[in-house]
From Swiss-Prot:
This is Regulator of G-protein signaling 21. It comes from Homo sapiens. GO terms for biological process: G protein-coupled receptor signaling pathway; negative regulation of signal transduction; sensory perception of bitter taste; sensory perception of sweet taste; sensory perception of umami taste; transmission of nerve impulse. Keywords: Signal transduction inhibitor. Inhibits signal transduction by increasing the GTPase activity of G protein alpha subunits thereby driving them into their inactive GDP-bound form. The lineage of its organism: Eukaryota, Metazoa, Chordata, Craniata, Vertebrata. GO terms for cellular component: plasma membrane. The keyword Kinase does not apply. InterPro entries: RGS (IPR016137), RGS_sf (IPR036305), RGS_subdom1/3 (IPR024066), RGS_subdomain_2 (IPR044926).
């Protein structure tokens, strides 16, 4: 039988942890959903979509799937006039373009880092000041609401 911890964590506390850093936000499904809604309102949801596609891509084991997923990411986010073209520098875009014929699991790493930094420095701080985030925090301030956190 699992032992329950004696500490409480309210939904508000969970929502507040998203403000600690972007990794905490991205690791939480509700936080990720809220961030995506915010980015969509700013017409920049392609950034988090690209980041998520890269995270999924890095888990790919099958060589054929690596090639097909890489081409899909390239055509959706990297190539000129892509439907969800991300804003990366020419050098990074050019390097990916040259390597896409024989992609590796690391072929998008540099672009993913650039997009992560862009979101962390620009979008994430604005999200924390947004009405979307404030409403989430305020709506979850329910008196005497307690949620047990299982230790095991």
């Amino acid at each position: 039988m699992p032992v329950k911890c004696c500490f409480y964590r309210s939904p508000t506390a969970e929502t507040m942890t998203w403000s600690e850093n972007m990794d905490t936000l991205l690791a939480n499904q509700a936080g990720l959903d809220a961030f995506r809604i915010f980015l969509k309102s700013e017409f920049s949801e392609e950034n988090v979509e690209f980041w998520l596609a890269c995270e999924d891509f890095k888990k790919t084991k099958n060589a054929d799937k690596i090639a097909s997923k890489a081409k899909m990411i390239y055509s959706e986010f990297i190539e000129a006039d892509a439907p969800k073209e991300i804003n990366i520098d020419f050098g990074t875009r050019d390097l990916i373009s040259k390597n896409i014929a024989e992609p590796t699991l690391k072929c998008f790493d540099e672009a993913q880092k650039l997009i992560y930094c862009l979101m962390a420095k620009d979008s994430f701080p604005r999200f924390l000041k947004s009405e979307i985030y404030k409403k989430l925090v305020n709506s979850q301030q329910v008196p005497n609401h307690k949620k047990w956190l299982p230790f095991l």
